[in-house]
Amino acid sequence: MPACKDPRWAYGALAWLIFFVVSHVVLVFYPGDDPTDGGPWSLRAYVIFNVVLISVSAAGAVVVHATVRPWARHLPRWLLLPPLLAGSILLVIRGVPGMVENLLMVTGVRRGGFVGADDISTGEFWAGLGINTYFFLGAVLLVGTTVSYGRRRS
């Protein structure tokens, strides 16, 4: 998929964002036995954190969707490009180190990743790989969307 002027990046990023929002809505309503994992924060902080993530991601989904819809063609470039850049930067900051951590874990250099314990369970190992890959995919899709939008509108 060439990066320039291809709307498929935006549709991929939109699907990623929708899944992210839905998964965090589920986490708010069904937090499990101990969603704070014994941390110093309360259930209220956990819910507030997830509501902020849901709100920012839903706004991001609207922005991404606007990059490929006819109703948004009249919107000025400065309205859509900064949030796309900000989201891309955040996902790259989360996704790229996650993939480096995946490489460390898979090669056995550091089975627990950057800060994990050396004796993690198989479930924790695979969950870490899945989550890191998921965020890396989000970074790739949103960066592709940002580049595609930037080239389309120039």
Regions found by a protein language model. Give the residues of each.
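Hydrophobic cores of alpha-helical transmembrane segments in multi-pass inner/ER membrane proteins
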Residues: L53-V63, G130-T146
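Extended intrinsically disordered, low-complexity coil regions enriched in Ser, Thr, Gly, Ala
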Residues: R8-W9, V26-G39, L104-G112, R151-S154
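Loop-to-transmembrane helix junctions at the membrane interface
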Residues: A66-I93
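Individual transmembrane alpha-helices with interfacial aromatic-anchor signatures
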Residues: P7, P83, G116-G138
